[in-house]
Amino acid sequence: MSRDEGTAKAKRVQVVGAPPPVHVGIRAPDTDSEHEHEEEHDGHLIDAESGANTNPTDDENESMRELMSVFPDDETDLDLTHLRIKSTKPLNLGRFHNTLIRLGLRQNEIRSMHGKDLGAVPHLKELDLYDNAIEHISGLENNLELEVLDLSFNNIRHVSRIAHLPKCHTLFLVQNKIAHIRPTDLQPPIPLSLRSLELGGNRLRSLENLSQLTNLEELWVGKNKITSLDGIASLKKLKILSIQSNRLTKLEGLDSLEALEELYLSHNGLTKLENLE
């Protein structure tokens, strides 16, 4: 929002319905139980319901190696969407060690993030693992140049092993199984760089342990179970707050958000709007 030189910034808050979606399509709420759905036997992942081995077969590995052979060694952008990839190992990412900037692996069947593979491309700035089967965040120890990370539509329960990313400004964790943010999950240095955080469609009941994200400008937490805005007051640079489809019954802490421009509140338990001056 622009302002004339020498005049105070006007606070413009939009209390509207659902904002334009960032991700195309939103799945129905996850109804899986809290229990794990896979077992580990002899280092191989086994689907607990079907008993099927989820590791790629030799034929699948060979097919993937053939596919990757068409890319030059100096490739900067790999889009490997919807190819039934189960593991990053046959991608041989080390071949792109010096040049790869963007890696798209959305809509595949990847269950694990391996540091040996992802760490082989240390200059990576954008990593897209949207719509896979990942349960734990890992393998990003050497990806210190990462700026955008998309782990939406997976089976992640904890926001772990990303706090060390000093340049990450955009983090997508939409539609996972995250019930709470632990104190160590978003400790420095990531609070210094993070500008946009998307946690919509999870199992959050509060905004606990987000107060250290003092540079955050966008927070998207729609479709959770949040009952209170406690902790929001410290996010003084926040410009967009999307908290529709939660369990709010009153508004608190918004008066300190002087940079706030857009506020999405539809589908809560509010009976009147207060503290929006």
What are the functions of these language-model segments?
Residues 1-135, 144-153, 157, 166-205, ...:
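The feature captures the LRR N-terminal capping module
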